[in-house]
Amino acid sequence: MPAPSHRRRARLGLAVGVTLSLLAAARGGHAAGLYFSDRGVRPMGRAGAFVAGADDLGAIWYNPAGLADAKTSALVDFSWLRFNAEYTRALRIVDADDVVRVVRSPTVEGSSPVIPFPTIAGSYNFGERREFTVAGGVFAPYAAIATYPETVDGRPSPARYALGSFEGSALIFGGGFFAYKPTEQLRFGIGLGALVGQYQSTVTFSASPPDRLLAAPEQPEYDAESRFRVGPIFAPTGSFGATWVPLRFLRVGASFQLPMVVSSSTRFDVRLPTASVFDGGRITGRDAHVRFTLPHILRAGVEVRPTDELRIEAAYVREFWSIHESIDMTPEGVAIEGIRGLPPRVPIPAIKFPRNFQDSDSFRIGSEYTFDLAGYKLDLRAGVSHETSAIPRAYLSLLTIDMDKTVLSLGGGLHVGEHWRLDAMYAHLFASSVTVSPEEARIPRVNPLPGNAPLEAVNGGQYSASADLVGVGVNYIF
């Protein structure tokens, strides 16, 4: 005897839900655009305008040619990105009678834990004219790692279908660099490195039978929690740059970073819903493969030094996110088994999740002024930048939250003797609010089973975010 309709639909929802959990693993690997802010305590004191004027170990990210002026030195700094986000979900539902409804959820707030993002680097300067410099370093991207509550106003959080926790995630960029200064007017640099680590998260999916399997009311007893780990990640890249000093007071710099291809295994666990219709069901297989591409980056800057004490740089950065068209996820032997009313084994197919990102532009102005105070040399830094989002509004979601943003920054450096420099920085990131109407939202429900209801976008709603960046560091010249 065939299973009742609602039971059959719920069991089909389980297959869809497992697919969603795998897809969440793939999407999560992107880590909210990988970073919400540019990096480095001294560079961000200048709002990231540190391309032509790069002259210490902070150059490993901005322009490796600047390492030619880093001398033999060591740098350690730590920054905390205090990130806050709010999301009010709006879901467009077309029920079985073709009635269109928009369901709005309570506003959910997410915040980042206290994570000190490090930079650790060292350089060695050598040659008859000290024209060669080798350097190495490791650092963490300034990722907007937010955790959202499980409940809002006593009800399950609407964010539970986007993301939960990122505990256990660790992504580090490491690399080696070489710089050459043939004359006082020219500097060249090259670097080879890789993004390494692992990404962990929890995501809840719904196999609720009413309104096309996964739509409202999304009863909690039909929720299933998935935990996944993407890794080990090893995504190599390279960079090269040049700095030209045609006049004593003028520096022109540019650099280019190659794209990174993340191609990694994924392992996941799914806790089935507690509803009785899932009794007897099981999931076989735990492995999948995720692949996507992170962008190449072009940086250019012009720095003027009207006096020996004052530096002012205007910089431009273009990140070619249009290369990030999709995330491809291939399950490896994952299937649903033991569900009455379904075939004995329902395999989960490969998925191509559309991203359709766009190139982003950043315009930056930063300054640095050096003066003597009570027998110590002190650097004061300030800057402002504006960056456009790489995420088209229709594809914005909590898993990859990014908007147009403006950064205001202040920083300073205290020189102690001839060898030590102590740095500090504060920046505030003003991000614009974005409303994604349910009609324009384009992140779909993923349904691998033919014959089910039409796909419905799930990322509609209002998004807002802001962040503070605080950092301290020390630089030592041998």
Where are these regions (language model features)?
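Intrinsically disordered, low-complexity segments
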Residues: 3, 19, 376-379
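N-terminal secretory signal peptides that target proteins for export/translocation
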Residues: 1-9
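Outer-membrane beta-barrel porins/channels
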Residues: 30-43, 115-478
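N-terminal, post-signal peptide beta-strand-biased segments of exported outer-membrane/organellar beta-barrel
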Residues: 28-134, 138-140, 359, 427, ...
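Bacterial N-terminal signal peptides
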Residues: 13-24
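Serine/proline-rich low-complexity intrinsically disordered segments, especially terminal tails, linkers
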Residues: 7, 23-26, 107
